[in-house]
């Protein structure tokens, strides 16, 4: 646990400054009420249709290979990458037996929130590139649009992006378009 905390501190220093200012989860001086304030301000400007996207079992389904590739773009020390990979695969105890983990992030681990933000940073950058107004808090995303039709198109295109490019599943039952009053 101590090694994970130390690793998280070093990675936080390297990554946090490059995260989107629309990413609010697990970050210094960024809280859920800040995300709410951003969305409220957008609604006051006429953006009244929200895409509420839920990523299905996000922490349990993060692709290790993809995450390691993302980390390797910034971290050039192979020993650090190897250490993180070992932490990811360290396993879970099931019926007294330790099983190595092939996918997912350990929930409650000191490194997991930061790794989650690193993994989802690509989604934030894509939303910014497309000019969307959004707020993301951990694995919860709200994207706000001017019309219902725009919101429905946005939900469809983001679902494709998340599933095809980021290799995550969107929870269709919990993801929807709603009017913001």
Where are these regions (language model features)?
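Glycine-rich active-site/cofactor-binding loop and its immediate structural neighborhood
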Residues: 4
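Short helix-capping/linker segments at secondary-structure and domain boundaries
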Residues: 11-18
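Conserved polymerase palm-domain catalytic core
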Residues: 18-181
